[in-house]
Design a protein with these regions (language model features):
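Active-site-proximal specificity loops/subdomain of glycosyltransferases
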Residues: 86-129
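Short beta-strand-to-loop acidic/aromatic patch adjacent to the donor-nucleotide binding site
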Residues: 131-142
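A conserved acidic beta->alpha catalytic loop
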Residues: 70-79, 141
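Conserved donor-nucleotide/metal-binding helix-loop-beta segment in metal-dependent transferases, i.e.
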Residues: 144-167
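Short beta-strand/loop segment that forms part of the nucleotide-sugar
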Residues: 50-73
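Active-site donor/metal-binding and catalytic loop motifs
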Residues: 244-262, 271-278, 288-293
Length: 436
């Protein structure tokens, strides 16, 4: 197939239908520094795995199309993508999507303006006759490898999976927000052990693409900020067949200043809490969890140990207790406040925030979010020192154990979230029990 540079509007007409069975969508905005490598890796992945020379699971030839969903980059991103693809054995279709005024001033936590619009444009481009699988890649990733494409598409094309979530290699200290809140809460709510549900890449089936496009979430504020989490939750709660694919390291091209932790908590945790309200009939019926199969062999990676000031984390927790205790009483019962008070005078090396207490704290904040006991932004920001206290406690417990031991420790935490879930359910059903 010949590479083209055609362009169309995401809200006007879909790209012209082709015989493609696989669509790879790249979401981009001012990614000129990375888009060339991303596009080249996508091209190589398609050629190596799906052109008949290196079959994947018996699939000899899979016709493919590359779709670039660009948000109006002014740095030459689309041109650089076309140059990198060259005479690729795939069709490049550029899909522009409008960004609402203010997008550049209200950047989501993953740093991508109007990401929900970009993903919707890609899904609409993949919702054409004959397409069996769609893979989404972010144009700002520095570490995309050709193997990512068959890893994300293969389980859909060859094994009947509907949603393929990446599993990235991370040091035990990395991805702490995912390990401490997102993963255990997601697992307890939806009953699936999807370990990294907030990342920006995935593979999806035609059935899942159609379900996403039929959902009425695209114009909601929570979707604009946390669309990746919503897509993962939709797959988990919708009865679709899920798996994970090991992709190695993921590093991202950052633009501008990184968001502060409070803003990140507002956006990431706020998305999860908003999803609780929308899927209450699903998660209240879920008990326990089931593992998600890992399809493929993890690539060999070398992980560097981040430098973390544990004493500084503990001091931030203690300062937060002194300054925010009265605010916390609006969302936590007296017993939890007393348990936190006991941590103020503990020597740093013996600082431990128990798993069951941490799970109840997260559930209390979810209930406080639902009941609007405080402005939601203020409520979620007040979670920051509590999260830092949990992080300090976790680092102290895993810093001298091998990676397998750190993984086992997160498993214990996730089990605590499952065990404490009735606490959330009962207070959700009977709000008068809140803060008791």
């Amino acid at each position: 197939m010949t590479s083209t540079g055609s362009s169309s509007s995401a809200e006007a007409t879909k790209p012209a239908a082709t015989t493609a069975e696989l669509v790879v969508g790249i979401a981009s905005y001012n990614d000129v520094d990375t888009i060339g490598d991303v596009a080249a890796a996508v091209r190589s992945g398609l050629e190596e795995a799906f052109d008949g020379t290196a079959s994947l699971g018996g699939a000899s030839i899979v016709e493919s199309r590359i779709l670039l969903a660009d948000g109006g980059s002014n740095d030459g991103t689309p041109q650089r993508a076309r140059e990198a693809l060259g005479p690729a054995n795939a069709t490049l279709v550029e899909v522009t999507y409008p960004r609402a005024a203010g997008d550049l001033l209200d950047v989501p936590y993953h740093g991508r303006p109007a990401r929900a619009r970009a993903l919707r444009a890609i899904l609409e481009g993949a919702h054409t006759p004959g397409v069996k699988a769609c893979v989404v890649i972010d144009g700002g990733i520095r570490t995309v490898a050709p193997g990512w494409i068959p890893a994300l598409a293969g389980p859909v094309l060859d094994e009947g999976f509907d949603y393929v979530s990446p599993f990235y290699a991370r040091h035990p200290y990395e991805g702490a927000l995912t390990k401490g809140i997102v993963y255990p809460l997601f697992r307890a709510l939806y009953g699936v052990r999807l370990r990294q549900p907030a990342v920006g890449e995935f593979g999806g089936s035609a059935r899942l693409v159609e379900a996403y496009l039929d959902a009425d979430v695209w114009d909601l504020d929570s979707a604009q900020i946390g669309i990746d989490l919503w897509l993962a939750a939709g797959a988990a709660a919708g009865g679709f067949k899920l798996c994970e694919a090991p992709l190695g390291r993921r590093t991202f091209h950052t633009r501008g200043e990184a968001l502060d932790l409070g803003t990140t908590l507002v956006q990431v945790v706020g998305t999860l809490f908003a999803d609780l309200e929308g899927r209450v009939d699903v998660w209240q019926r879920v008990r326990g969890s089931v593992p998600v199969p890992l399809i493929g062999d993890p690539p060999a990676v070398v992980l560097e140990t981040p430098q973390v000031n544990v004493e500084g984390l503990i001091e931030s927790f203690r300062l937060g207790y002194r300054e925010l205790r009265d605010i916390w009483t609006w969302t936590m019962p007296p017993k939890s406040i007393v348990d936190l008070r006991r941590l103020l005078d503990v020597p740093p090396q013996r600082f431990r925030l128990d798993d069951d207490l941490w799970a109840r704290i997260v559930y209390d904040f979810a209930l406080g979010y639902r009941l609007r006991v405080l402005p939601r932004d203020h409520l979620l920001r007040s979670l920051t020192p509590l999260y830092l206290g949990w992080l300090a406690s976790m680092i102290l417990q895993v810093r001298d154990v091998p990676p397998e031991g750190a993984d086992a420790r997160i498993e214990q935490l996730a089990l605590a979230f499952e065990a404490e879930k009735p606490y959330l359910v009962s207070r959700w059903r009977w709000p008068e029990r809140f803060r008791t």
